[in-house]
Amino acid sequence: MSLIGAGIFLYIVFHSSDTTDKISMKTVRILYGTFTGMAIVAALILLFLRRPPYEKKKMNQSYGELLGSTFRMLITQEMLLLAVVFAYTGIEQSYWTGIYPTCISFTQQLGNHTNSYLALNSVASGLGQMIAGLIIGILGDHIRRIGREKIVLLGTIVHLACFVLSYMNFPSRASIEKTDSSGHLWTPNLPVTYTIGFLLGFGDACWNTQIYSLLCDAFSHKSSQTFAIFKFWQCGLSSAAFFYSPYLELQWYLLILIIFSVFAAASFVLFEQFWLKPYKRKVAPMQNKGTELPSSPPSYSSCASGSFSEHIKEAASYKRVTIFQMDRWDSQLLNQDFLTCMNSYFALLFPSPISN
């Protein structure tokens, strides 16, 4: 929605200005003033948001220990395999947010109002992201049966189509300088331009939603470190792509994207099929119906107060406690009052036959 709203705003500002493909100082002041004001308002809203009704117990790790565990996790086999996925999202992000809009702006055969075209391209990308998000959200549980890897493969196919269309629609120098040249196969035109923008947003949503889902599922007990590594690779490769993009013609940038997209899709499928799914099959829950346990472990305060006890009793009565849940809890409880919580935990799950 943010891309759609921003695109509509930019279109109104650019379309009402007197210039065609140049931005006047008056327009610059309007844009910077509006976006600065909105950023301040957003920061204030975030600052005054209500706190949650309870405080979670903080981990007893120093910043140095937390940083060390993040670096150790960075070189594990799982993270090295997923690094290709994270890197691709960074390069792809630099393309649809920076390089592709530059191609639109520098391709003079599209017309004189290229700034307005940029705004409409933002709307098209936002619509692509929104529609992909709605489809994935509506499917919901069906996604788990379909498989995350199939959604990622769909996003990969969509992105590959975008890269091929970009090559056909834009001249080689469009990513570097203004040009009057035609595309490699046809004259640049707006319908194809907006279609590419829509598909870039659609594919980006397919990739990112499934990456977030994968990380939350596979590394729920180390979510902070995992997302830090994800952003490290994504932002690092996005920054690197912006550095080398002024020196590469469009076809070479697209070639890099195609290579990375194929390897990223392969890495995602390998991780999902040969690491995560076999592990889950070993720890699959029993088929008896009953109450699910929470996804997070009990805190010390909940163990001590007994607020968690009834829930464990109810779940245990249906035999819904799984090895996977207990393993995940154990990992998260290492830095809490372990003995107190686990004594309460196992006493409730396996009560003594001798009553008081």
Where are the regions that the model predicts?
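Transmembrane helix-loop junctions in multipass membrane proteins, especially transporters and channels
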Residues: 14, 18-19, 47-58, 141-145, ...
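Symmetry-related core transmembrane helices of the 12-TM Major Facilitator Superfamily/SLC fold
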Residues: 29-47, 254-271
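Non-transmembrane, juxtamembrane loop and terminal tail segments
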Residues: 57-68, 279-323
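C-terminal transmembrane module of eukaryotic multi-pass membrane proteins
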Residues: 191-274
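Cationic, low-complexity basic patches in intrinsically disordered or flexible, solvent-exposed regions
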Residues: 333
